[in-house]
Amino acid sequence: MKVKVLSLLVPALLVAGAANAAEVYNKDGNKLDLYGKVDGLHYFSDDKSVDGDQTYMRLGFKGETQVTDQLTGYGQWEYQIQGNSAENENNSWTRVAFAGLKFQDVGSFDYGRNYGVVYDVTSWTDVLPEFGGDTYGSDNFMQQRGNGFATYRNTDFFGLVDGLNFAVQYQGKNGSVSGEGMTNNGREALRQNGDGVGGSITYDYEGFGIGAAVSSSKRTDDQNSPLYIGNGDRAETYTGGLKYDANNIYLAAQYTQTYNATRVGSLGWANKAQNFEAVAQYQFDFGLRPSLAYLQSKGKNLGVINGRNYDDEDILKYVDVGATYYFNKNMSTYVDYKINLLDDNQFTRDAGINTDNIVALGLVYQF
């Protein structure tokens, strides 16, 4: 019986971090769910900057309120707290925080810190036990989590076509800490963005999925400084993906092409980058889920770095072999081996890109 229950629970747990949420309140059209996890995590690597304790905790809530028969209000907040640092260090941050309204079949609109629409497709490969999803990053235009997202989403195409979903999104400027490009939440140039727009469309049918997403953001003056490579008026992203999720098998792949949007270590952005991620997983009925993945990000026509001219270089390239074992819906353990395929050379040293392998061991409690 336990084996059969695990085979049903594990796929649900992988859909979203809040899939296993604890219901705190549900009365008179108001609902509040609390979710979170504690990951006792350790890295083993020759790279001393990551080797060691990586323990962290995430905590969040999702709430809904029934305004009318046709209108529902909702909100979500998620926070991460590092458990590997001293108590006097402020190593915690908000991952998402947004509120919105859903108009039955018409769609939903929300605003706040949220995921960019590009992640509607690239999230399909961001399912590895620990690593993965790093051909892009947070606060990187509209590629993943970011600030100031206004998002319209429509599920099942106005209730007419099951599985056909689309989204349209706008992101406001997040600029510098001072000067003409200053905004109230200013940050370093590598995490800034100008006004941006994007959209996504996905279709799921009997376990098969296909999707595409695009985004285009104005770049800030700081980002076009001579201090950085990859200057340009706009940062653009074009992505497409496929997935299969049925019969205990999960397969997914995505290809993304970016212009002035993929970060090159701490040096800036690639004028053009080609990013590819692919993953294969199988869920055994007794709780074991092995995983195999390949990820690569290749920068094109990078330009001059520290007085040296670089053309085409791999920014990221590795094979990932891992496995997760689910004791039950609340407890799991995993191992994830990142086999780095990058060579230690002048480019990686100039860009500050890690070329060492990493083994991650984790023990997770989630609710």
UniProtKB/Swiss-Prot annotation:
GO molecular function (one): porin activity
Source organism (scientific name): Escherichia coli O157:H7
Coiled-coil stretches noted in the UniProt entry, renumbered to this chain: none
Name of this protein: Outer membrane porin C
Any one of the GO BP annotations: monoatomic ion transmembrane transport
Topological category with respect to the lipid bilayer: Multi-pass membrane protein
Matches recorded under PROSITE patterns: GRAM_NEG_PORIN
Intracellular or extracellular location(s): Cell outer membrane
Gene3D superfamilies assigned: Porin
Free-text function comment from the UniProt entry: Forms pores that allow passive diffusion of small molecules across the outer membrane.
Record gene name: ompC
GO annotation, cellular component aspect: cell outer membrane; pore complex
Signal sequence range: 1-21
